[in-house]
């Protein structure tokens, strides 16, 4: 596998560990991935959930935790690889999270769950902090590249193209996710590889394309590399590692899951998502969960209307209440059978 070049950086292992929140990919996991020569990604979604005072002031705790986890991940990495963050566009404090991450020294900022149309405006030093949108179609890629070109006279440092087999929030309709054979993801990747060429030529840069969603093993990696992409983003497989920041019970839920345990859900974020069908999912499919408190996490969320509080559901899960929490997962979770380490997993993937 060739190294991944992003701006001035050369990343020895062309693997990005996908951001997973709440609290699944923090400094322990991201730092370990970077130490192996890849790109470790911290999710900023309610990142401060374990900080003292979180129940009273989520915003302040999240900003403090962003700084803390980036510093700790870089310390673990020991100068290897890159440390980045994933910031969801849907977050109420999106701008503050991006600025805090850049100021704390995040090497890359990856942004999805909506189009990050204003992301370039939030980066003071584009030579220091590299940015990438997450897109799921050539149409979305063309739109964001055109917007950044027109409004900010710059382009993306790389593109993360997420297919329909990914976990968490997905840029596809529920109907598409229930009829996967009708989605030509390879075709979308090929179109994106063509559409980025105009902006590469205009700005005299290379825009690497990273394939994400359902990448499980070296066979999957070879398939997308043969299409012409520059690297892959993998998330679910990193959950069943010793270094993952989730509770042991959360990791065991992944290991014990079968393909038939997967559900397509509607998230309060306003997007469909892929998650484990546990007692929590079965309950909220039938009746609205009582919401006792709003954690002010999303720009567009009406507690009176949404079926459950996504912050509470995700925090319950990461802390180990795997029956009553929300467990996002990729489509290949049923193939995960045992715990491993980040070192061994990456050696397997690149071997």
Regions found by a protein language model. Give the residues of each.
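Conserved active-site-proximal phosphate/metal-binding subdomains
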Residues: 16, 166-210, 216-351
